[in-house]
Design a protein with these regions (language model features):
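Phosphate-group recognition and catalysis centered on beta-loop-alpha active-site segments
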Residues: 1-343
């Protein structure tokens, strides 16, 4: 059975500002199996890595007087949001901005890089990954070692219905870019993910790359809400809902509380049936997000301890801000499992 995969959530976002080339590079060096870029669109149709299209909280745009008049309010996925939006900037303008740490009060060390890092495009991220792969291959040949596994990418389409309504549909652009860089087919070393359902179904008609239905702990996929479909994320994780997902996706990416909830004191409880229900219909399970800081941990456990509980529950991979700890926990768990089997 393949070992669980370690997905670097927004890169090594525990060690550097998220969605920067430095963050992705650190994650690769830490041994992540996949790096995860969240994708949004520029005015001129370029995919760039940001967790949301409003960039006031993760760049220096608020201090850039030349862009003061770009501040506006937009309705994004049914919610009024005020700030600066990627779709109001051409790529050359976004490239003048500099990334900032999202949660400086939790990760003050990351602020040392504030002001020094650009917003990367998907093309730049893929080039970084390919370059790292080539260096690994060369090093392995020099040392007479087996060729290493490729480094995977795990892009998420952010606000796909919203961008489609602006004439900036993401699906064909994403597939074309990935194929041009050699990512194609079921073994193409890429997963494509979304919190919406319709664009995943559209992607399933464009590519054989595996798709991942992301699942929030509550609420409704925006495209279902927009169409009048009354189903919620809770409906999607019923046996009937999972069977439908299995018709267009290979995996789900649930909020981790849907796999193992916490009690009122913050301690992990017994696992739910979600992993078993997914495996029964052929879906893999990649929960999110595992973070090492105390503010995010269950009571009584560090990150390795938390991951040990989730790995024991049968997950097939996980998103983490600290890929080095994730790799260490995964390797320790799989080594221990093999030793138990051989005894």
């Amino acid at each position: 059975m393949p070992q669980p995969i370690v997905i670097a959530h927004r890169g090594a976002s525990g060690y550097a500002p998220e969605h920067t080339l430095v963050s992705y590079f650190i994650a690769i060096e830490q041994g992540a199996d996949y790096v995860e870029p969240d994708l949004v669109m520029t005015r001129d149709g370029v995919m760039v890595a940001r967790h949301e299209n409003e960039i006031g909280g993760t760049t220096d745009v608020a201090e850039r007087g030349e862009f003061a008049d770009r501040r506006t309010t937009r309705i994004v996925d049914g919610t009024a949001v005020t700030g600066w939006f990627t779709e109001d900037f051409r790529l050359e303008e976004l490239k003048t901005l500099r990334a900032r740490e999202r949660i400086p009060e939790v990760r003050p060390a990351n602020t040392r890089l504030d002001g020094g890092l650009e917003i990367p495009t998907l093309e730049e991220i893929l080039a970084l990954v390919r370059g790292a792969e080539e260096r690994r291959r060369v090093r392995a040949r020099e040392l007479g070692l087996p060729q290493p596994e490729p480094i995977g990418v795990y892009p998420e389409t952010k606000h796909p219905s919203y961008f489609a309504a602006l004439g900036l549909a993401m699906e064909e652009r994403l597939v074309e870019t990935l194929e041009r860089h050699g990512y194609r087919g079921r073994e193409g070393r890429a997963f494509l993910q979304s919190f919406e359902t319709g664009n995943l179904k559209a992607l399933s008609r464009l590519t054989e790359l595996p798709l991942v239905q992301l699942i929030e702990a509550s609420g409704t996929p925006y495209d279902l809400l927009q169409s009048g479909d009354r189903r919620t994320y809770a409906d999607l994780v019923t046996p009937k809902g999972l069977e439908e997902i299995a018709g267009y996706a290979s995996s789900i990416g649930p909020a981790k509380s849907l796999v193992i909830p916490r009690d009122g004191e913050g301690r992990l409880m017994r696992p739910t049936s979600l992993v078993a229900d997914c495996h029964a219909v052929g879906l893999k399970v990649h929960p999110w997000t595992f973070r090492a800081e105390e503010a995010f941990l269950p009571a009584g456990l560090d990150l390795e301890g938390e991951l040990r509980e989730f790995l024991a529950a049968g997950i097939n991979g996980f998103f983490t801000d600290q890929a080095d700890i994730g790799v260490r926990a995964r390797d320790a768990f799989t080594t221990g499992s093999r030793e138990r089997i051989t005894k």
